[in-house]
Amino acid sequence: TTINHNYWLLMLDSNLYSDVHGVGAPKVNGLLSQTTLQWIDNIFQLAQKKNKRIIPVIHHNTVTHYQALEANYTLDNADELRDILFKYGTPFTLSGHIHAQHYATIESANHKLMTDIVTGAFASYPSYISKISFTDNAITYQAEPLAMTDNAITNSIINPQLRDYSNYMKHLFDDSSHKMVYGEMIEGGWYQENDPLLEEVAQYVAALNLAFFAGKPINILDLQDIPNIEKIQQLIDDNATTFFKDYLKMILDNQTDYTELRNIHW
């Protein structure tokens, strides 16, 4: 698809489909066939002849963003796709699947860099859209929340959920996080009915979970309304699964804001 005089958009379907419709769970991992890879190479050859730059868009990640999420999230044959992208000097891809605002960069054997940018899922708080500006030799990327409330007011939409969209979506997100945390407690055998500290654990994890999906570092202000932080962390350390603890540590260690303006040059 032509974006402007200089750029083409290349939409790639990496999903795997069942021959038996509606039976069993869908496949989560993704793969590009050898036929598709050859077609991609041909498209890049054509673009090169016409002096066009290509922006590839794909569901599965072309670079691993988190080691714990490599299986089923990074394209099964991402290395083969990256070989083509490095060959033609493509510096970035747009992908999704992990639902979290993030970017990850990989370096080729001859020191070329390629960045995979994931825009957070529009269906979950804070409902990001990506804004991309183009020049002849660079793009500027930034993620920002959709201004749904402004649109609802401008168009006289009276639906209360749309007029207070941010708070509505945050409530849904927090509710989902609470269910995840209580599931961890119950499955791990450390849920105790009527223990008030467990609700604080759920609030604490919900705040961290929000920071992860929003692509922002956790700020002390995000936790200021949660008392007993040390007790909460100790309870988690003593009882939660290794995966759960590692997930929270990864969020606490992050110092990068993945929504900030990012410039990528050819």
Question: Language-model segments: which ranges?
Answer:
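Non-catalytic terminal accessory segments
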Residues: I153-W266
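Acidic/polar loop patches that form or flank catalytic/metal-binding clefts of enzymes
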Residues: T93, T140-Q142
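Acidic/histidine-rich helix-loop elements
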Residues: S18-L32, D150-D164
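His/acidic metal-ligating clusters that form di-metal
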Residues: W8-M11, V23-T115
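Solvent-exposed loop/turn segments at secondary-structure junctions
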Residues: N15-S18, H60-T64, I98-H102, A121-S124, ...
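Active-site-proximal beta-strand elements of phosphoester/diester hydrolases
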Residues: N6-L16, V20, V57, T115-G120, ...
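Active-site-adjacent helix-turn-beta-strand microarchitecture at beta-sheet edges
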Residues: T1, Y103-S124, I129-D136, A143-P145
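Short acidic, gly/pro-rich beta-turn/loop elements at beta-sheet edges
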Residues: V20-G22, Y66, P126, Q142, ...
